[in-house]
C-alpha cells in the first residue's frame, strides 16, 4: 500500500512555517516571493477570537471598513477593499458567506498583494483565507462554554476520530451563541452545525463537509459625525439612534468537496468544489439628517426582504515537481469556474420623519412598513467566470528561485433592478493576468524577494447610475525580506506600491447609495510582521504598517486619502507560559495592544476618525486531570477606551463604535 501525504500548515505555537494556499503548493514561507501572514490556531485560542476582526487585528496594514451595520466582514488590505469584494476565501475557495469566521476555523492566512493569478477576480490588496478543521484519524474532542460581561454566553462541541473497521474519519462541530449586545438594546444570536467526513484510500483522500449557520444580529450603523463641531454628536456611546427592530435575520450554508489523488510521489491532482448560500431579511431605521441646534434626527425606515445569494466554485489542479534543464520546477496548472448570483427582492423605503432627539432619546415613534419601492426592488446580479492558469517555481540553484505564472480569465456579467426589470449592465470580456517573482535565499533562514503582479475585478453595478462599469485593474510592485530566527521566530518586511484604475466608491444620493468609479488610486506602504517564540516561555505576534492611499485621478477627489485607510497600524500580543507548575497544572498570562491612527471617515475627507490604542489581556489555567480542563479569562479594551472602528465612507451618518471594556470567562475540556 502506498503512503498518503496530506500537505498543509506546519506550525509551532505562534510561528507559521507554511501556508500552502498562498502558492497552491506546500511551499515554505521563505520560498514565496510575496508577503504571507498566518494567525495560528494557538493565537486564535489564546486571544479567544470571536470574529475575523479579532483575528486580523494581529496583521499589518488591515483595517475595518463599512460592515453594513455590523452584518458583514469588511476589510481594507494595503489601502483597498470593501464588503462583498470576494477577498475572503474559505479553504482557498470563494463563498458568499457574510461572516467567514466560526467554530470550524482552524487558522487564518493573509496573502498580501495581487492574488488574481492564483485566485481569479481579486483586489491588489490581497486575499484572506480561512482554513477550516478537517476530520482526523485519531480520536479527540473538546467541549467549551463561556460567559460574557455583556450578558449571556456561548457553547461549542468539536469531536473527531476514525470510524472503526473502515477507511473513514469524521468530524462534528456545533456551536451556539446568545449574548447581549453592548449598546442599549439588541442581542447576538447564532448557531452552527457542521459535520464532515473523510475517506482515506491507498492514493486518494476525499473530504466532504457541510456547514449551516443561523443568525439574528443587530443592524447598527453607529453614530453621527458633527463636522462643524469636529466630533461625534454629544450622546452616550451606548445610546443607539435606530430602533429595536434594527435586526438582520438569516441563515448561511457551505457545502464543500475535496478530492486529492496522488498520481506518483511527485505529482498530484486535486479537485475542489464549494456551494455557498446566504439568505436574509433586515429592517433598519436609517438616519437621513441631523439638526445640531435642536438635536432632532430625521430617520427613514428601510428594509430588505427576500435577499438571496448563491455561489458555486469549482477548481481542478495538477501539481508536481520535475527536473528540466538541470533545474527543479514546482509546477501548478489548472482550471477554475466561479458563479455568483445575488437577488434582493423587496426593497422597502418608508417616508422620512423627524422621529428622534438626542436630548430626549425615546423609541417606538416609527414602525416597520410594507412600502415596496418598485424601481429599487428585484436588484439582480449574476457573474460567471471560467479561467485557466499556470505557474512554475524554478529553482535555479540552492539560492535563487524564480516564480512565473499567468491566468486567462473570462467573465460574463449582467445586473439591473426594478419592476419592471431594467438591465443596466450586460458585459463580458477576458483578461490575461500575469505575475513574476524572484527569491534569493541568502542563508537557509533568510530570504529576499521581489515581485510584480497584475489584478483584475469586474465590478458590482446594480446600484450604478452609470450602467456598465469598467473592470478594476491593478498593478503592484513589491520587495521584501523574510527571516526564521532561532527558537522559532518568523519575521517579514515588505515595501510595495500599487496602482488601481476604475476604482468604485459609494455616494449617498438623496438617500440612495449609488456606485461610482474614480479614475486611479495609489497605495504605497511598508509592512513588518513578527510571530513565534522568543524564549521557551515567551511567544509573540506583532505588526506595524505605514499605508499611504490617495486618489490620483478623479473629477472630485484627486489628492484625497481613501476612506477608512489608516496611515499607521500596529499591534503587539505577548504570551508568557509558566509551563508545568509544581502541582502538575499549567498557567499562562498574555497581554497586548492594538493601535490605529486617524483615518478619513468620508470620501471627501471632511472629517477624520481619531486614532486609538486598545489594550487586551488574558490568563489561562489548565488542570492536569485525565481530561485536561482549561479555565480562561479574556479582557478586551481593558481601559475602556472610546474609539471608532470604521465608517460608511459615503456619508457622516454611520460611524461604528468599537466595543467598550468586556470580559469573557470560559471553561473547556479536552478528551
Residue map of PLM features:
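Acidic/polar loop-and-plug regions of large Gram-negative outer-membrane beta-barrel proteins
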Residues: 177-181, 194-262, 275-309, 352-381, ...
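Acidic, small-polar-rich N-terminal luminal/periplasmic segments of exported/outer-membrane proteins
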Residues: 2-138, 479
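Conserved C-terminal beta-signal and adjacent last beta-strands/turns
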Residues: 331, 450, 477, 563-671
